[in-house]
A protein has these predicted regions:
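Flexible "cap/lid" loop of the alpha/beta hydrolase fold
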Residues: 125, 129, 138-164
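Conserved alpha/beta-hydrolase catalytic His-Asp/Glu region
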Residues: 150, 163-218
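Active-site loop/oxyanion-hole signature of alpha/beta-hydrolase fold enzymes
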Residues: 75-115
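Conserved HGGG/HGGXW glycine-rich cap/lid loop of the alpha/beta-hydrolase fold
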Residues: 38-83
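Gly/Ala-rich beta-loop-alpha elbow adjacent to hydrolase catalytic centers
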Residues: 116, 120, 124
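Residue in the alpha/beta-hydrolase core beta-strand immediately N-terminal to the catalytic nucleophile
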Residues: 113, 136-139
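Bacterial N-terminal signal peptides
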Residues: 7-15
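A short loop-to-beta-strand scaffold at the N-terminal edge of the catalytic core in hydrolase folds
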Residues: 30-39
Protein backbone atom coordinates (compact mmCIF):
# COMPACT_ATOMS: atom_id res chain seq x y z
CA UNK A 1 0.00 0.00 0.00
CA UNK A 2 2.83 2.36 0.95
CA UNK A 3 4.61 1.61 -2.34
CA UNK A 4 1.39 2.30 -4.25
CA UNK A 5 0.99 5.67 -2.52
CA UNK A 6 4.63 6.58 -3.22
CA UNK A 7 4.21 5.53 -6.83
CA UNK A 8 1.07 7.65 -7.16
CA UNK A 9 2.82 10.64 -5.58
CA UNK A 10 5.75 10.29 -7.97
CA UNK A 11 3.37 10.11 -10.92
CA UNK A 12 1.60 13.25 -9.77
CA UNK A 13 4.91 15.09 -9.38
CA UNK A 14 5.98 14.09 -12.88
CA UNK A 15 2.61 15.13 -14.26
CA UNK A 16 2.89 18.44 -12.46
CA UNK A 17 6.33 19.03 -13.95
CA UNK A 18 5.03 18.29 -17.42
CA UNK A 19 2.08 20.61 -16.86
CA UNK A 20 4.40 23.40 -15.74
CA UNK A 21 6.27 23.13 -19.03
CA UNK A 22 3.19 22.66 -21.21
CA UNK A 23 3.15 24.88 -24.27
CA UNK A 24 0.20 27.28 -24.51
CA UNK A 25 -0.87 29.99 -26.92
CA UNK A 26 -2.71 33.24 -26.26
CA UNK A 27 -3.47 36.62 -27.81
CA UNK A 28 -2.24 39.78 -26.12
CA UNK A 29 -4.28 42.78 -27.30
CA UNK A 30 -3.74 46.52 -26.96
CA UNK A 31 -5.03 49.42 -29.05
CA UNK A 32 -5.54 47.86 -32.50
CA UNK A 33 -2.66 45.40 -32.07
CA UNK A 34 -2.93 41.67 -31.43
CA UNK A 35 0.18 39.66 -30.55
CA UNK A 36 0.14 35.88 -30.75
CA UNK A 37 2.25 34.55 -27.86
CA UNK A 38 3.61 31.04 -27.29
CA UNK A 39 4.36 30.41 -23.61
CA UNK A 40 5.78 27.50 -21.64
CA UNK A 41 7.60 26.65 -18.42
CA UNK A 42 7.80 28.29 -15.02
CA UNK A 43 10.54 30.38 -13.49
CA UNK A 44 12.54 33.49 -14.41
CA UNK A 45 11.25 35.12 -17.58
CA UNK A 46 12.97 34.77 -20.97
CA UNK A 47 11.61 36.27 -24.21
CA UNK A 48 12.81 34.87 -27.55
CA UNK A 49 12.70 37.07 -30.67
CA UNK A 50 13.29 35.58 -34.14
CA UNK A 51 15.19 36.72 -37.21
CA UNK A 52 13.73 39.06 -39.83
CA UNK A 53 10.88 37.50 -41.75
CA UNK A 54 10.89 34.39 -39.55
CA UNK A 55 8.37 33.42 -36.87
CA UNK A 56 9.17 32.36 -33.34
CA UNK A 57 8.41 28.69 -34.02
CA UNK A 58 12.04 28.47 -35.16
CA UNK A 59 12.74 28.43 -31.41
CA UNK A 60 10.62 25.34 -30.62
CA UNK A 61 13.49 23.14 -29.42
CA UNK A 62 15.33 25.97 -27.68
CA UNK A 63 12.18 27.03 -25.83
CA UNK A 64 11.44 23.47 -24.71
CA UNK A 65 14.98 23.09 -23.40
CA UNK A 66 14.84 26.35 -21.46
CA UNK A 67 11.45 25.44 -19.97
CA UNK A 68 12.85 22.12 -18.76
CA UNK A 69 15.72 24.00 -17.11
CA UNK A 70 13.27 26.04 -15.04
CA UNK A 71 12.51 29.15 -17.07
CA UNK A 72 9.28 30.78 -18.18
CA UNK A 73 9.67 31.25 -21.94
CA UNK A 74 7.58 33.66 -24.02
CA UNK A 75 7.72 33.84 -27.80
CA UNK A 76 5.71 36.74 -29.22
CA UNK A 77 5.05 36.24 -32.91
CA UNK A 78 6.03 39.37 -34.84
CA UNK A 79 3.30 41.43 -36.47
CA UNK A 80 1.95 39.88 -39.64
CA UNK A 81 2.80 36.33 -38.61
CA UNK A 82 0.27 33.68 -37.55
CA UNK A 83 -2.40 35.42 -35.42
CA UNK A 84 -0.35 38.56 -34.74
CA UNK A 85 -1.90 41.66 -36.30
CA UNK A 86 -0.81 45.25 -36.53
CA UNK A 87 0.30 47.94 -38.97
CA UNK A 88 3.35 47.04 -41.07
CA UNK A 89 3.67 50.26 -43.07
CA UNK A 90 5.50 53.35 -41.82
CA UNK A 91 6.37 51.72 -38.51
CA UNK A 92 9.62 51.89 -36.52
CA UNK A 93 11.55 49.69 -34.14
CA UNK A 94 9.85 51.61 -31.33
CA UNK A 95 6.52 50.11 -32.42
CA UNK A 96 7.89 46.56 -32.49
CA UNK A 97 9.58 47.11 -29.13
CA UNK A 98 6.26 48.22 -27.65
CA UNK A 99 4.68 44.94 -28.78
CA UNK A 100 7.32 43.03 -26.83
CA UNK A 101 7.04 45.33 -23.82
CA UNK A 102 3.26 44.87 -23.61
CA UNK A 103 3.69 41.09 -23.68
CA UNK A 104 6.21 41.25 -20.80
CA UNK A 105 4.04 43.69 -18.86
CA UNK A 106 0.91 41.54 -19.20
CA UNK A 107 2.83 38.48 -18.03
CA UNK A 108 3.38 40.34 -14.74
CA UNK A 109 6.34 38.16 -13.76
CA UNK A 110 9.06 40.76 -13.35
CA UNK A 111 11.65 41.97 -15.85
CA UNK A 112 12.75 39.59 -18.61
CA UNK A 113 15.94 38.57 -20.32
CA UNK A 114 15.34 39.13 -24.05
CA UNK A 115 17.14 37.00 -26.62
CA UNK A 116 17.21 38.52 -30.10
CA UNK A 117 18.40 36.39 -33.01
CA UNK A 118 19.81 38.26 -36.03
CA UNK A 119 17.24 41.02 -36.80
CA UNK A 120 15.61 40.25 -33.46
CA UNK A 121 18.63 41.80 -31.76
CA UNK A 122 17.46 45.27 -32.87
CA UNK A 123 14.01 44.75 -31.40
CA UNK A 124 15.57 43.42 -28.19
CA UNK A 125 17.87 46.43 -27.90
CA UNK A 126 15.09 48.91 -28.58
CA UNK A 127 12.83 47.26 -26.01
CA UNK A 128 15.59 47.72 -23.43
CA UNK A 129 16.06 51.37 -24.44
CA UNK A 130 12.37 52.28 -24.41
CA UNK A 131 11.24 50.06 -21.52
CA UNK A 132 14.28 49.48 -19.25
CA UNK A 133 12.12 48.63 -16.22
CA UNK A 134 10.83 45.54 -18.07
CA UNK A 135 14.23 44.23 -19.19
CA UNK A 136 16.75 42.46 -16.96
CA UNK A 137 19.22 41.65 -19.71
CA UNK A 138 19.68 41.33 -23.46
CA UNK A 139 21.27 38.41 -25.32
CA UNK A 140 22.42 39.18 -28.86
CA UNK A 141 22.39 35.92 -30.84
CA UNK A 142 24.17 36.16 -34.21
CA UNK A 143 23.57 39.90 -34.07
CA UNK A 144 24.21 42.03 -37.13
CA UNK A 145 27.31 44.16 -37.40
CA UNK A 146 27.05 47.84 -36.58
CA UNK A 147 27.61 48.62 -40.26
CA UNK A 148 25.35 46.12 -42.01
CA UNK A 149 26.26 45.77 -45.71
CA UNK A 150 23.28 46.53 -48.01
CA UNK A 151 23.97 43.31 -49.92
CA UNK A 152 23.23 41.24 -46.82
CA UNK A 153 19.89 42.98 -46.36
CA UNK A 154 19.10 42.16 -49.99
CA UNK A 155 19.93 38.49 -49.36
CA UNK A 156 17.48 38.40 -46.45
CA UNK A 157 14.77 39.92 -48.66
CA UNK A 158 15.48 37.36 -51.39
CA UNK A 159 15.33 34.51 -48.86
CA UNK A 160 11.86 35.63 -47.76
CA UNK A 161 10.45 36.27 -51.24
CA UNK A 162 8.39 33.29 -52.39
CA UNK A 163 8.34 34.71 -55.94
CA UNK A 164 12.09 34.17 -56.26
CA UNK A 165 13.11 30.80 -57.77
CA UNK A 166 13.87 28.19 -55.11
CA UNK A 167 17.49 27.75 -56.23
CA UNK A 168 18.16 31.48 -55.80
CA UNK A 169 16.49 31.53 -52.39
CA UNK A 170 18.58 28.57 -51.25
CA UNK A 171 21.77 30.26 -52.46
CA UNK A 172 20.85 33.44 -50.59
CA UNK A 173 20.06 31.53 -47.38
CA UNK A 174 23.27 29.50 -47.67
CA UNK A 175 25.34 32.66 -47.97
CA UNK A 176 23.79 34.70 -45.19
CA UNK A 177 22.46 32.19 -42.64
CA UNK A 178 24.03 28.75 -42.99
CA UNK A 179 27.57 27.49 -42.46
CA UNK A 180 29.28 25.48 -45.16
CA UNK A 181 27.94 21.93 -45.19
CA UNK A 182 24.63 22.88 -43.56
CA UNK A 183 21.41 22.38 -45.51
CA UNK A 184 19.35 25.59 -45.91
CA UNK A 185 16.31 23.67 -47.18
CA UNK A 186 14.92 23.53 -43.64
CA UNK A 187 14.28 27.29 -44.01
CA UNK A 188 12.48 27.17 -47.34
CA UNK A 189 9.25 27.43 -45.36
CA UNK A 190 8.42 29.65 -42.41
CA UNK A 191 8.93 32.99 -44.15
CA UNK A 192 6.50 35.91 -43.98
CA UNK A 193 7.28 38.22 -46.90
CA UNK A 194 5.07 41.20 -45.98
CA UNK A 195 6.20 41.11 -42.36
CA UNK A 196 9.82 40.91 -43.48
CA UNK A 197 9.46 44.08 -45.53
CA UNK A 198 7.71 45.82 -42.64
CA UNK A 199 10.59 44.90 -40.34
CA UNK A 200 13.13 46.21 -42.85
CA UNK A 201 11.32 49.55 -42.98
CA UNK A 202 10.98 49.66 -39.18
CA UNK A 203 14.74 49.41 -38.79
CA UNK A 204 15.39 51.97 -41.52
CA UNK A 205 13.08 54.48 -39.82
CA UNK A 206 15.26 54.88 -36.71
CA UNK A 207 18.82 55.97 -36.11
CA UNK A 208 20.89 52.87 -35.52
CA UNK A 209 22.70 54.66 -32.70
CA UNK A 210 19.42 54.73 -30.75
CA UNK A 211 19.67 50.96 -30.33
CA UNK A 212 23.17 51.12 -28.87
CA UNK A 213 22.17 53.00 -25.73
CA UNK A 214 20.38 50.04 -24.16
CA UNK A 215 23.13 49.26 -21.63
CA UNK A 216 22.95 52.76 -20.18
CA UNK A 217 19.15 52.69 -20.17
CA UNK A 218 19.11 49.51 -18.07
CA UNK A 219 21.38 50.84 -15.31
Amino acid sequence: MRMAILSLAATMLLAGGALAQERARSLVKYDTIEIDVIAEGRGPLIVLLPSRGRDSEDYDEVAAGLAKKGFRVLRPQPRGMHASKGPLKDITLHDLARDVAIVIERENAGPAVIVGHAYGNWVARMTAVDHPNLVRGVVLAAAAAKKFPPRLSQLVSKSADMAVPEAERLAAMQEIFFASGSDPKIWLKGWWTEASEGQRVAAANVKQSDCFTFAAAMR
